[in-house]
């Protein structure tokens, strides 16, 4: 089956991509570029020869191949990124009719489709944060930025969370009011943001175009007058679409972040909930979002378009940073004023770092599971685990749901602290038998990470995130090479168990 990855792989050669096929179905490949093809490609650009029958037939064949390749590629983009993303990629990336689908065009169209579809592995998760932005193109088109906190983890829809932070002026700004501090207002949802980001003139043209096309379709093209034919050419561009109330709006660029704690994929409710170690602190963001809205009502906070603290982008960034974005990427304030473009770039950097860490965490989990394929390692690890008998899961579930009493939580925190000490002692015991000449740099790095990153009940979310990232990345590098002995495999499993303790303490920290 043809997919986006097949086009990306074929385009790496630098040649144009073509779609062929046989009885087994269509196949994507790089176009043949032999002596004959090179000669005809050269002659097609020579004024005196490009109209020759042979050259013209070759050029027309290439155009037809390029069109077919583009059609199949857009279909593949639609399956992965949705119709809106594929349409945006075609509108902005295809450009010339019959142009070759080469490496640059494939890369650009995939990038555009990803942009309109939304960026981030957290998109299908029940607990997520969405950072939205509309491009800033100067003071006349300043764009916008907003942030939404969603929690649809509970089976009862009445307990779902939808907190939207969208900072606007309470009046239309004049050309000389960009530095004025005026009364703010907050919008309650993304749909209202979309409507606010499309001008009344554009909305009118879109309605006229839609009405003209409907009339021409009903009556026939030959009965349409000149104005109707002119209006019918005004199609919505990528991102411009009607909502369920038949109102036009402009879709935003979207960046998705996971919430720390137990989460699940909304598309697959049968799968068990998994703990997300790297993400944003939902409770802290909700508190700050509500503080911002209270500040708007009380007059403590104002709107100022050119500002580092009181425009839409700075408010969205404020709530994002309240959730711990700076645990992953340091934040650098704008020199004069925050804007949606700078905010979007920072959100992308944070999302990329979070997703990379979570992917590394999942990779460590898979590799450590394979270490147990050895019977001797499995038996030794089972003996160590059964001697402790502690488990992080009950604490994590209870703490994450807020159902454990304070006394029970403290008792389990003490239990986890003892388990941290036990894992550390076991790791040290396994390492004691290795002399200096047998310890390589990776061993030393893992031993140092185990010592520095042991969690405790005193750690807050920032400290636990820092410890988890160091330990996950260090262990991940250590797992790139197969273990030379059973003791080496057991040290890796001990480091993996320490990551599990960090998860348990993290669950308690976000519930506090």
Swiss-Prot record:
**What keyword terms does UniProt attach to this protein?**
Coiled coil, Secreted, Virulence
Asked whether the UniProt record includes Secreted among its keywords, one would answer yes
Record-linked Pfam families: SicP-binding
Q: Does the keyword Nucleotide-binding apply?
A: no
> What InterPro entries does the entry give?
Globular_prot_asu/bsu, SptP_N, SptP_N_sf
Where is it localised? Secreted
Return the similarity comment: Belongs to the BopA/IcsB family.
Which named protein is this? Answer: Effector protein BopA
Task: Specify the species.
Answer: Burkholderia pseudomallei (strain K96243)
Q: What is the lineage of its organism?
A: Bacteria, Pseudomonadati, Pseudomonadota, Betaproteobacteria, Burkholderiales
């Amino acid at each position: 089956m043809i997919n986006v990855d097949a086009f990306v792989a074929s385009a790496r050669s630098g040649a144009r991509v073509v779609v062929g096929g046989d009885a087994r179905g269509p196949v994507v490949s790089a176009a043949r570029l032999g002596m004959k093809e090179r000669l005809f490609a050269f002659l097609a650009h020579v004024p005196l020869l490009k109209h020759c029958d042979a050259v013209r037939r070759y050029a027309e064949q290439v155009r037809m191949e390029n069109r077919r390749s583009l059609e199949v590629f857009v279909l593949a983009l639609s399956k992965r990124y949705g119709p809106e993303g594929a349409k945006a990629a075609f509108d902005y990336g295809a450009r010339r009719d019959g142009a070759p689908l080469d490496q640059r065009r494939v890369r650009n169209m995939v990038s555009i489709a990803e942009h309109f579809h939304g960026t981030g592995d957290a998109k299908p998760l029940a607990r997520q944060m969405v950072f939205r932005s509309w491009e800033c193109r100067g003071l006349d088109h300043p764009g916008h930025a907003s942030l939404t906190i969603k929690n649809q983890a509970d089976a009862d829809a009445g307990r779902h969370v939808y907190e939207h932070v969208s900072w606007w002026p309470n009046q239309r700004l004049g050309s000389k009011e960009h530095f004025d501090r005026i009364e703010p207002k907050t919008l309650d949802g993304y749909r209202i943001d979309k409507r606010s980001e499309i001008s009344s003139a554009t909305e009118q043209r879109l309605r006229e175009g839609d009405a003209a096309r409907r009339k021409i379709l009903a009556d026939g093209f030959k009965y349409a007058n000149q104005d109707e034919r002119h209006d019918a050419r005004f199609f919505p561009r990528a991102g411009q679409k009607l909502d369920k109330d038949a109102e036009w709006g402009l879709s935003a660029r979207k960046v998705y972040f996971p919430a720390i704690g137990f989460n699940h994929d909304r598309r697959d409710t049968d799968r068990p909930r998994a703990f997300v170690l790297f993400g944003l602190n939902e409770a802290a963001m909700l508190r700050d979002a509500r503080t911002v809205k209270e500040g708007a009502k009380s007059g403590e906070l104002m709107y100022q378009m050119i500002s580092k603290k009181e425009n839409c982008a700075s408010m969205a960034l404020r709530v994002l940073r309240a959730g711990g974005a700076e645990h992953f990427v340091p934040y650098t304030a704008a020199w004069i004023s925050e804007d949606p473009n700078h905010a979007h770039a920072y959100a992308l950097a944070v999302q990329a770092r979070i997703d990379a860490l979570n992917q590394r965490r999942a990779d460590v989990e898979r590799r450590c599971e394979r270490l147990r394929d050895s019977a001797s390692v499995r038996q030794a690890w089972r003996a160590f685990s059964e001697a402790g008998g502690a488990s992080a899961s009950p604490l994590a579930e209870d703490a994450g749901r807020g159902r454990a009493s304070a006394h029970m939580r403290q008792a389990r925190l003490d239990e986890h602290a003892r388990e941290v000490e036990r894992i550390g002692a076991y790791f040290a015991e396994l390492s004691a038998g290795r002399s200096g000449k047998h310890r390589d740099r990776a061993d030393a790095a893992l031993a140092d990470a185990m010592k520095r990153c042991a969690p405790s009940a005193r750690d807050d979310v920032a400290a636990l995130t820092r410890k988890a990232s160091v330990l996950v990345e260090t262990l991940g590098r250590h797992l790139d090479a197969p273990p030379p002995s059973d003791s080496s495999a057991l040290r890796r499993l001990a480091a993996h168990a320490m990551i599990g303790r960090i998860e348990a303490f993290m669950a308690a920290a976000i519930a506090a």
